[in-house]
Amino acid sequence: MDPRYWGSSFWIVIFIIITKFKHDIETCKRHLYNICKALPCAECKDHALQAIQKNNIMSSNDINYIYFFFISLYNNLVFNPERCIDIKKVKKLI
């Protein structure tokens, strides 16, 4: 399934979850992991889960580390470079 059709919706959900659960990090991580496991593209799912594991996201207790990890992941995968998030303009959540 082509992520150009559903990808932006998943990214919106990911960033909503991070901001909504910034004070409940365990719930946040659980939701993020489940979303990545449910990605309709097998390659995207594998890539996301490998990146989560490689960067120790599930063992992190720092919401900003998780937030900036997902921003970086998004920027590395975005189809249109104009849609990249300028990391210099992003403020920490807490």
From Swiss-Prot:
Cofactor(s) demanded: FAD
Pfam families attached to this UniProt entry: Pox_E10 (PF04805)
Reactions catalysed: 2 R'C(R)SH + O2 = R'C(R)S-S(R)CR' + H2O2
Enzyme Commission identifier(s): 1.8.3.2
Molecular function in Gene Ontology: thiol oxidase activity
ERV/ALR sulfhydryl oxidase domain mapped to chain residues: 1-94
Signal sequence interval, chain numbering: none
Keyword Flavoprotein in record: yes
Keyword tags: Disulfide bond, FAD, Flavoprotein, Oxidoreductase
Disulfide bridge partners, by residue number: 41-44
Family annotation (InterPro entries): ERV/ALR_sulphydryl_oxid_sf, ERV/ALR_sulphydryl_oxidase, Sulphydryl_Oase_FAD-link_ERV1
Family, as annotated: Belongs to the poxviruses E10 family.
Purpose of the protein: FAD-dependent sulfhydryl oxidase that catalyzes disulfide bond formation.
Name recorded for this polypeptide: Probable FAD-linked sulfhydryl oxidase FPV093
Taxonomic source organism: Fowlpox virus (strain NVSL)
